[in-house]
Design a protein with these regions (language model features):
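Short acidic N-proximal helix/loop "leader" segments that mark the beginning
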Residues: 1-8
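Acetyl-CoA-dependent GNAT
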Residues: 9-13, 17-21, 25-86, 92, ...
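Acidic/polar helix N-cap motif
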Residues: 19-22, 97, 133
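A short, internal acetyl-CoA/4′-phosphopantetheine-binding micro-motif in the GNAT/acyltransferase core
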Residues: 94-101
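Conserved acetyl-CoA-binding loop-helix of GNAT-fold acetyltransferases
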Residues: 102-115, 138, 142
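Conserved GNAT acetyl-CoA-binding A-motif
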Residues: 117-128
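Conserved beta-strand-loop-alpha-helix junction that forms the acyl-donor binding cleft
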Residues: 126-136, 156-160
Length: 161
C-alpha cells in the first residue's frame, strides 16, 4: 500500500499515507464524522487495521498531520468502469477537525487523494454528499468536481495521467 509515503508537504504540515500506529486517532475521527451526520459508529480499531493495513487492504487512508498530531483524514475505495477498463477511487470520507476547518486542510487532503489516485492509475475521483450539505457541495464544485445527475448528490473529477 505504500505506507509512510509523503504525498504532500503543506503550510500546516504533511499529508501522507496512514500507518498502523495512526489507527486509534483515525477511529476517533471516524466517530466525529459519523456523529456530525447523526450516525452510530461500530468501527473498531481491529476493523480499520484489517481494512487499511491487513494482508489484503480494502481501502486507502490518507492523514493530515501537524506537529505529530493527526488533524484530518480521507478514506478511498476502489471503483471501476470495467467496460472501459477505467479505474477510479471513491472519496468515501473526508474529514478535518472542526477547530481548524477553513484553513486549507480539506483541500490538501483532496490534492493528496488526486496524487494517490494517479499513482494507482485511476482516471477519476468520485465523492458523494448528504443532500443538505450545501457547504460540502460548494467545496467540491470549487475544486472543479462536476455534479452528476441523481440523488444523493455525487461529484466526479477527471484526472489527467
Amino acid at each position: 500500500m505504500g505506507q509512510d509515503t509523503l504525498l504532500l508537504q503543506t503550510h500546516f504540515g504533511t499529508v501522507r499515507d496512514a500507518r498502523p500506529s495512526d489507527t486509534d486517532s483515525i477511529v476517533q475521527m471516524v466517530g466525529k464524522l459519523a456523529a456530525h451526520h447523526g450516525d452510530a459508529v461500530t468501527l473498531t480499531p481491529e476493523d480499520l487495521v484489517r481494512d487499511a493495513f491487513g494482508e489484503k487492504p480494502w481501502i486507502h487512508v490518507l492523514v493530515a498531520e501537524t506537529d505529530g498530531e493527526l488533524i484530518g483524514y480521507a478514506a478511498l475505495c476502489g471503483l471501476i468502469q470495467l467496460q472501459f477498463g477505467v479505474r477510479g477511487l471513491d472519496m468515501h470520507h473526508l474529514f478535518t477537525e472542526e477547530k481548524i476547518r477553513g484553513r486549507g486542510i480539506g483541500t490538501a487532503l483532496v490534492d493528496a487523494c488526486k496524487t494517490k489516485a494517479k499513482a494507482l492509475s485511476c482516471r477519476y475521483l468520485m465523492v458523494g454528499t448528504h443532500p443538505d450539505n450545501h457547504k460540502a457541495q460548494a467545496f467540491y464544485e470549487a475544486l472543479e468536481f462536476m455534479r452528476r445527475d441523481g440523488h444523493p448528490p455525487r461529484f466526479s473529477l477527471r484526472l489527467e495521467n
